[in-house]
């Protein structure tokens, strides 16, 4: 997907399927930095552009490169204990009764009138 939101006119969009070259310890240039350098060379101001610029990283960060040493990956894991604290407010007797009645299970008994079966002598069935 990527950040290819603004392409058209004089804007050039790099292909997302291009093979990215690996770099050593050089800082990763971004599109906004390259665009600023291009604007500076052309003598135009940044606010004169017609569309907003979105920062897109041209090279993958070093942390995304896979290493064969799995123990170093495990040593980079950090776990955090998260505690959610909620202050309990005291309830009045009326509030407790209302809350209990709202969450209480209601039961009902349904009584249907008993049908008296009648025999139909023509068909030989109960009606």
Curated annotation (Swiss-Prot):
Superkingdom to which the source organism belongs: Eukaryota
Phosphoserine PTM positions: 63
Keyword entries, A-Z: Phosphoprotein
Region (Disordered): 51-75
Transmembrane segments: none
Signal peptide bounds: none
Chain positions found as Phosphothreonine: 30
PANTHER family, per database record: CHROMOSOME 11 OPEN READING FRAME 52, HYPOTHETICAL PROTEIN LOC689959
The protein's name in its UniProt record: Uncharacterized protein C11orf52 homolog
UniProt organism field: Mus musculus
